[in-house]
Amino acid sequence: MFNDRYKGLRIAVSDSAMRELIKEGKTLYDVVEILEDGYDSPRKRKFGTIEKWLNKGKKTYNAVIIKDYHEILKEECWVLTHFGKFTGGNKK
């Protein structure tokens, strides 16, 4: 679970984001794909927050991550705070 990385840092998942991933039947591998292959969201987010969108067919998937310090692992990591799917996103 903690072997998936983005920009060299591991990705941890918040409880709510884990529920969203399970609901959509997706894994951290899918999150990494969105972060690496997706495009920046047109929304403004707080400094240090990254939101990426990826179009797949008629659906657009989005992932929101923030950089944080993981107390158990004793290292910086990304925390997935939101994962979602919607229709009618920007066509890039």
Predicted regions and their residues:
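Ribonuclease/tRNase effector modules and their secretory precursors
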Residues: M1-K92
